[in-house]
A protein has these predicted regions:
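Short, cysteine-centered beta-strand-loop-beta hairpins and adjacent loop/turn segments enriched
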Residues: 41-48, 60
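Conserved, non-catalytic sequence blocks in retroelement Pol enzymes and Pol-derived host proteins
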Residues: 24-28, 42-45, 93-98
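A general secondary-structure signal for short beta-strands and their flanking turns/coil
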Residues: 31-33, 48-50
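Proline-anchored loop/turn motifs at beta-strand termini and strand-loop-strand connectors
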Residues: 56-62
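N-terminal leader/pro-regions and domain N-caps
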Residues: 1-31
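Domain-scale recognition of soluble eukaryotic interaction modules
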Residues: 2-10, 14, 65-155
Length: 155
């Protein structure tokens, strides 16, 4: 299966298997760049937060894992920095993983304190503040404003 046909299947899968915890969509100009929005994991200091970022796929996807960047401050991951997560690295990445699997893993990984490229450690209070303020975020790249999706019944 080519990268392009795999990505088309991913788009269909994302629509058919709607989640209340996240959504993602390809950029209008580049099907290899997917903007994502996730809810902070429940029962953590991220709960109530809405976090936006980008998954950069490549021409070898799914053989190579996408890179992940957050745009919304969250106190766990640096913004505008490619993350290198060991559990999501090529050692753990498998070609049968979908973008849905990746986003679910990312949500589950948020509260885990491990040091890696792109990680930061802010206090619980600061993370709670980021979660509260995340509703004011607007993506400069795609124009998505989290205030418009916070009450959306589909998310």
């Amino acid at each position: 299966m080519t990268t392009q046909s795999r990505i088309k299947n991913e788009m269909k899968n994302m629509i058919e298997n709607h989640s209340d915890e996240f959504f993602a969509y390809p950029s209008e100009n580049d099907y290899l760049n997917w903007h994502f929005t996730i809810k902070g994991p429940k029962n953590t200091e991220f709960e109530g937060g809405i976090y936006h970022g980008i998954l950069n796929l490549n021409n070898n996807y799914p053989s190579n894992q996408p890179t992940i960047q957050f745009f919304t401050p969250n106190g766990r991951f640096a913004v505008n920095t490619a993350l290198c997560l060991y559990t999501l690295s090529n050692k753990g990445w498998q070609t049968n993983w979908t973008l849905i699997n990746l986003l679910e893993a990312l949500i589950n990984y948020m509260p885990i304190q491990e040091s890696h490229t792109g990680s930061i450690t802010e206090s619980k209070e600061k993370r709670l503040e980021y979660a509260k303020n995340s509703s004011q975020f607007k993506c400069e790249k795609c124009g998505l404003a989290t205030e418009h999706i916070k009450g959306n019944v589909n998310f």
